């Protein structure tokens, strides 16, 4: 029963912490497709989206 509570606590902590590995850039944007080339150039991934007029890249 102790192990179950430890695993539950670890799951809660991991879900609270931002584990998405998203990285904000200083590049401004108006649409997510503008971020794809920026993310490819800066972080070697083409997965990105425009959030609050800034590109966010996901690895």
UniProtKB/Swiss-Prot annotation:
Record's protein name: Potassium channel toxin alpha-KTx 1.2
Source lineage: Eukaryota, Metazoa, Ecdysozoa, Arthropoda, Chelicerata
Gene3D superfamilies: Knottin, scorpion toxin-like
Compartment(s) where it occurs, according to its Swiss-Prot or TrEMBL record: Secreted
GO molecular function terms attached to this record: ion channel inhibitor activity; potassium channel regulator activity; toxin activity
Entries under Pfam families matching the protein: Toxin_2
Modification Pyrrolidone carboxylic acid occurs at: 23
Keywords attached to this entry: Calcium-activated potassium channel impairing toxin, Disulfide bond, Ion channel impairing toxin, Neurotoxin, Potassium channel impairing toxin, Pyrrolidone carboxylic acid, Secreted, Signal, Toxin
């Amino acid at each position: 029963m102790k192990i179950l509570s430890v695993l539950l606590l670890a799951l809660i902590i991991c879900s609270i912490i931002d584990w998405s590995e998203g990285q904000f850039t200083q590049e401004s944007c108006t649409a997510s497709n503008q971020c794809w080339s920026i993310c490819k150039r800066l972080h070697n991934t083409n997965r990105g989206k425009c959030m609050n007029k800034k590109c966010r890249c996901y690895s």
